[in-house]
């Protein structure tokens, strides 16, 4: 397994729409394993393949405190959503920035697991929010897209400044 490079906003590759996975095979399973390693190394709770410049419909999530409840979503589909909630979300592709994002309080999805077996899942609370956040990545949407243009511009400027400082270091 290896840690993959996470793309950072405003990189245009984050806006690409991910293609469905045609077959879950050893290559896809290796991508899933590398994504988990990357997510844990970056101290995240979710990661979409788009964020590591792999434009396939793959998501990994682990919202558990002990980091021992891995969830793999390949070709996820949203079946139902209900209620309203929102928390200050962060994103590995938008480092050190957080913002309140409106989300459904509960979701029901269908996806394939790491072995290509279909399953359905009902989720609420943090898991539902994380699923929605990561599914947004698969269609090129970021949490900053829910913000006002002014807030989005401020975040972009902060990240561009951080990138310049890091390039000099």
Swiss-Prot record:
Domain of life: Bacteria
GO molecular function: metal ion binding; peptide deformylase activity
Catalytic activity line of the entry: N-terminal N-formyl-L-methionyl-[peptide] + H2O = N-terminal L-methionyl-[peptide] + formate
Active site (UniProt): 134
Essential cofactor(s): Fe(2+)
Annotated disulfide bonds: none
Cofactor mode of binding and number, as noted: Binds 1 Fe(2+) ion.
Keyword Protein biosynthesis: yes
Gene Ontology biological process terms from the UniProt entry: co-translational protein modification; translation
A Pfam family hit: Pep_deformylase
Keywords: Hydrolase, Iron, Metal-binding, Protein biosynthesis
Binding site for Fe cation: 91, 133, 137
EC number: 3.5.1.88
UniProt record similarity statement: Belongs to the polypeptide deformylase family.
UniProt function note: Removes the formyl group from the N-terminal Met of newly synthesized proteins. Requires at least a dipeptide for an efficient rate of reaction. N-terminal L-methionine is a prerequisite for activity but the enzyme has broad specificity at other positions.
Protein name according to UniProt: Peptide deformylase
UniProt lineage: Bacteria, Pseudomonadati, Pseudomonadota, Gammaproteobacteria, Enterobacterales
Gene that specifies this protein: def
